C-alpha cells in the first residue's frame, strides 16, 4: 500500500501553496470536472492538492499532522526562518532522525526530516 492523494483544505489556497513551495514543491493551478480551482503538486507517487474550504467548513482542520523528508534540509530551514515561520521544535537529533517541527499558515504541525 502507498499514499496516492493528500488533500488540504484552506481559506487561502495561494498562501498555502506558496508556503509548501518553500519545501521545493512546484504547484499547478487548475480544475478538473466540477471541482473548484486548486493547487496540485506531486511528491513521488503522491499528489498533494490544496483546495478551498467546502461550503460547510468555517476553518481548516488543524489536527492533521504531516511529515516530509527534505533533501536540502539546512537551506529549507533557513528559508523558513527568513519567511517568519514559527518553529515549535528547533532542528535537533531525535530518535526518529534529525528533524524540526513547524506550523503551516493554517496552524497544522509539520515535521521536517533531514534526508
Q: PLM ranges: what are they?
A:
Residues 7-47:
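Core segments of cupin and vicinal oxygen chelate
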